[in-house]
Regions:
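DNA-recognition alpha helix
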Residues: 2-17
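Bulky hydrophobic/aromatic content
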Residues: 3-5, 31-118
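A structural signal for short hydrophobic beta-strand segments in well-ordered beta-sheet cores
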Residues: 41, 134, 162, 220-221
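General beta-strand recognition
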Residues: 50, 114, 142-144, 229, ...
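Core beta-strand-centered patch of the WYL/Sm-like small regulatory domain
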Residues: 81-82, 86-198
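Polybasic (Lys/Arg-rich)
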Residues: 182-275
Length: 275
């Protein structure tokens, strides 16, 4: 897209009140996009001075850049949709996002934090930890930390306070948050052994799993008019089991046998509430 084409799009946007796009304004926005999202916008002089994204790979699935880009895009669309704001319904995100700025700053500087925390079933306490990574899961933010003894995960909406200290730490060069969670679904990590899980999805559930896979290891094994079998190589923790149960009668666990039996016990226990 040439600068002239960009300018026309800019003028047509109601936010600009029809004012033309200045070259200096465009350059500032281009620099901001690079700093915030990591997208490099370059000009192809040999092709009519058209601007293009030089590194589209940063928008791959599950990347922070893709999430930021999507968030900014949606934010822009919503800001331009005041006339229909009462017809756009958003999910509530718990108040823990209030601590995101200080946590991100502590991660940038590799600073320890003092965190006030209270579990749902516990008393308030303070703890000094090393912030390694942030993870968003099911509308909740979680902080992955090193406590000085082990890796642990804390929910931001259970934090009572966060203070960045002057104490620095060194994050292990070989530690990858993505690799840490790779064998799990959700945020719960424990010693649950790896398993080759096969599930049978009935009706529309097959399409739900195709369009929004539960895990990167998800593969489609068999498909018929009535059902589709999917397999996973995963640690079937409580988070994963809870997700399987959320599909109600649309999903059946076939393998392994011990997981199938565990699901059956959970369903039997649930039925007792209605007896």
């Amino acid at each position: 897209m040439t600068f002239e084409e960009l300018n026309q799009k800019w003028i047509e946007d109601q936010v600009t009140d029809g004012n033309p796009l200045q070259r200096s304004t465009f350059n500032r926005h281009r620099d901001a996009i690079l700093n915030i999202v990591g997208l490099i916008i370059e000009c192809d002089q040999a092709n009519g001075y058209k601007y293009y994204i030089a590194n589209p790979e940063v928008l791959e699935d599950d990347s922070i850049e893709r999430w930021l880009f999507s968030t900014l895009t949606v934010s822009t669309i919503l800001s331009e949709s005041v006339a229909v704001k009462d017809r756009i319904i958003l999910e509530n995100v718990p108040a823990g996002e209030y601590y995101l700025p200080v946590l991100i700053q502590a991660m940038k500087l590799n600073r320890r934090i003092v965190m006030g925390y209270q579990r749902f079933d516990g008393e308030p306490y303070e703890k000094t930890v090393e912030p390694y990574s942030l993870r968003l899961c099911k509308q909740r933010w979680y902080l992955l930390v090193f406590t000085g003894h082990h890796i642990a995960t804390y929910a931001l909406d259970r934090m009572l306070s966060v203070e960045m200290t002057d104490e620095t730490f060194e994050m292990p060069e070989d530690f990858s948050p993505e690799a840490y969670f790779a064998e799990y679904y959700g945020v719960l990590t424990d010693e649950t052994p790896m398993a080759h899980v096969v599930v049978r999805a009935y009706g529309r559930t097959s399409n739900y799993l195709r369009t929004l896979p539960l895990h990167p290891s998800q593969r489609e094994v068999t498909s018929t008019e009535d059902y589709t079998d999917f397999c996973f190589d995963i640690r079937p923790t409580a988070d994963f089991i809870g997700e399987l149960l959320s599909y109600d009668v649309g999903l059946e666990v076939l393998q392994p046998a011990d997981l199938r039996e565990r699901i059956k016990r959970l369903l039997d226990q649930s039925l007792k509430h209605y007896s």
